[in-house]
A protein has these predicted regions:
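Long, contiguous binding/interaction regions
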Residues: 2-93
């Protein structure tokens, strides 16, 4: 049964990704996320958008399920992309 604490144990990592140049990095970042899609439970993309302009930087927040090694591998793969910063956080309640 997945619920409450059990769910957090299985999906207890948050990965924050900062893209400093979305035009250059979006395709590669999307490819990496697609390859790791089975471990991504939630994805939230944040950037300044409007009718007159759209920011070239943005942040993606992911809830990661699986083993810590899988989350760390995704982290290192993303950090290897130029203009991309990433940080892994563990939710330990």
């Amino acid at each position: 049964m997945i619920g409450g604490v059990a769910m957090m144990e299985q999906c207890g990592y948050i990965l924050a990704i900062l893209q400093e140049n979305r035009v250059e990095t979006a395709t590669k970042v999307q490819e990496i996320l697609t390859q790791n899609g089975c471990n991504i439970r939630v994805r939230l993309g944040l950037h300044d958008a409007g009718l007159e302009s759209c920011s070239n930087s943005g942040m993606i927040l992911l809830q990661i399920c699986g083993e810590k090694a899988e989350a760390e591998n995704l982290l290192m793969t993303l950090k290897a992309v130029p203009h991309v910063k990433a940080k892994l956080m563990s939710l330990d309640f």
